[in-house]
């Protein structure tokens, strides 16, 4: 009986060891920068502190689209009318709107590549989200002093050709635009506690809202991965606690006379809108 017990416990011990080894073999490491095959939409707004509609219905519409599409949308706001609006990043804003076919007034809303009225915003977002993604990216952004250092990977999901660009934007939230705001920040027709959000402050490429080519190649294969690293220089006057980074992949329009010279492909960030 004792020999039988010893045999049983010995077998049990080997079984446990064998199970543990099996678990070790199954352990894998996931790349934190591996892009997901997920399509997101893009909303770009042109706005200003000097615009009453921007501070009322424009503000409400922008926030509603963010909230209703949280986790599905890249949302940025370019301010204009410098020097009356102190948040006008003139060169970036000008490069953005000069390659878009927009209207004559503000606010202006662009979903993907199209300038749209409010009633068309959600249907256009829904349409983009149904696309089969060409490519996607993922990144980390870590601040060191006045530099935001970015490490990213771009992944293609189709065999495709073209000139692809990438933009990283440093945006700021919770900028006081209410009754106690300073010159150039107080929002016309805004509430006493008004906050400017998603304000584009800078990008990794000076004076170009569409960034730069992340590869010299013009043909890409399914599952091809490309690494891209860069930095954005921040202004010490900004509140670094409220800065976040968002990114967009663009494709250069081969038709040089087209009103939209950079076509939205996809984008990524970690923002959650409530």
Q: Which role fits each region the language model picked out?
A:
Residues 32-78:
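Local sequence-structure signature of Cys/Sec-based thiol-disulfide redox active-site neighborhoods
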Residues 26, 56-60, 148-151:
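Short amphipathic alpha-helical surface micro-motifs
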Residues 71-274:
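Short, conserved sequence motifs used for protein processing/export or organelle targeting and
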Residues 16, 48-51, 227:
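Mature extracytoplasmic/luminal segments of secretory-pathway proteins
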Residues 20, 52-55, 90:
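Secreted/luminal cysteine- and crosslink-motif detector
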Residues 19-23, 50, 174:
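Feature marks short, surface-exposed loop/turn motifs that line or immediately flank catalytic pockets
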